[in-house]
Amino acid sequence: MRTGRWLLYDTNVYVSALRQGSLDPLPRRLRETLPRTYLASVVAAELRAGAITEAAKRKVREVTQWAQRVGRMVTPEAGAWERAGDVLGKIRQVEPHLRSKVPRLWNDTLIALCARDIGATVVTENLQDFELLRRYVRFDLRPFA
């Protein structure tokens, strides 16, 4: 990843880190990029929805509280919601075979638009959905590898 570039991690990167624990290199890699990292409120909501155990809830709270405390929480504004609707409508129109997938793309679309708005790169393990979105909206994307 380029030095000095803002990063916005997709939910799956945090989930992998939380599942693997603090001794694994994945969380260490996340910590190393914290000075360049924003957290999308959409990702925070997905993390909270998926945190079942008290330990998981505590870890998610730590991440979200850090982002809020240092001013690194990014939330889609009204215009982003409208653009997301336009993007998803265009996908339905141009690629009708993906019609059933469109409802599952809302959050990823909002994440991509938030990243674009702040000049960040989306980092994800879910390249397929984000590559689809890149056919309809410009944003920077990198695999988490």
Locations of regions flagged by a protein language model:
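Short active-site oxyanion
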Residues: 4-5, 34-37, 69-72, 116-121
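Phosphate- and divalent-cation-binding pockets in alpha/beta enzyme and binding domains
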Residues: 17, 46, 83, 132
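Acidic, PIN/NYN-like endoribonuclease modules and their adjacent C-terminal/linker elements
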Residues: 1-4, 112-145
